[in-house]
Amino acid sequence: MERKIINYIVVCINEFALSKNLTEQEAFRYLYANKGIEFLAENYDIEHTLSLQDAVNDLSIVCRNNGGMIQ
């Protein structure tokens, strides 16, 4: 995986954690378990052009669709 994609995923994890009142570790585990990390890696070309809030919203939807319970 390219460094720029890794950096973007890290930023998104941090933003997700802040928006959902989670630690970074909790956010990573949740996103990993519910395919959010996979989504970001596969859709980097589109997602990185959007705002971070849009990315967090997309992650919330993807994770809910894969069994996640965080609103």
Give each language-model segment a name.
Residues M1-Y8, A41, D45-S51:
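Charged, low-complexity, helix/coiled-coil-prone segments
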Residues D45-Q71:
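Long, compositionally biased
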Residues M1-A27:
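N-terminal acidic leader/helix
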Residues T23-E47:
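Amphipathic, hydrophobic secondary-structure cores in small proteins
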Residues V11, E15-L18, R29, F39-E42, ...:
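Charged/polar, solvent-exposed surface patches and flexible loops
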